[in-house]
């Protein structure tokens, strides 16, 4: 497999990941959440989705996998730490930070099925 083939594979994976994030964001909106950020990047890491419902802010990691267990297992302890660190930076910039509660969720996006939301996953 040449470099060109790897580039095509990476591009497809990025496109699939981006599409999964859009699907997850739409799913959250149907559940009454307001999307505050998609693919929010900080110097400490990236958060796929930042959403809010009332005083609850959720930081969501989206995983496109064939099964729920594979999606949950794909969020490593190191990734959880990066997401928490990035969320601390995001929260520090919010004027109403003191009254916000926060939660860390996972959304599994699987082919041919509705997304599965795992609240308080880590």
UniProtKB/Swiss-Prot annotation:
Organism: Rhizobium etli (strain ATCC 51251 / DSM 11541 / JCM 21823 / NBRC 15573 / CFN 42)
Pfam families in UniProt: UPF0102
Record-stated family: Belongs to the UPF0102 family.
InterPro entries per UniProt: Restrct_endonuc-II-like (IPR011335), tRNA_endonuc-like_dom_sf (IPR011856), UPF0102_YraN-like (IPR003509)
Domain of life: Bacteria
PANTHER family membership: UPF0102 PROTEIN YRAN
Name the UniProt record assigns to this protein: UPF0102 protein RHE_CH00320
Gene Ontology MF annotations: nucleic acid binding
């Amino acid at each position: 497999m040449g470099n060109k083939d790897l580039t095509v594979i990476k591009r497809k994976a990025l496109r699939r990941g981006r599409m999964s994030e859009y699907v997850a964001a739409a799913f959250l909106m149907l559940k009454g959440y307001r999307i505050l950020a998609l693919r929010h990047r900080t110097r400490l890491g990236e958060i796929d989705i930042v959403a809010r419902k009332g005083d609850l802010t959720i930081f969501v990691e989206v995983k496109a996998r064939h099964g729920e267990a594979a999606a949950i297992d794909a969020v490593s302890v190191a990734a959880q730490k990066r997401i928490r660190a990035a969320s601390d930076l995001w929260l520090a910039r919010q004027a109403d930070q003191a009254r916000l509660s926060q939660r860390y969720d996972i959304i599994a996006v699987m082919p041919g099925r509705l997304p599965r939301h795992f609240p308080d996953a880590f």
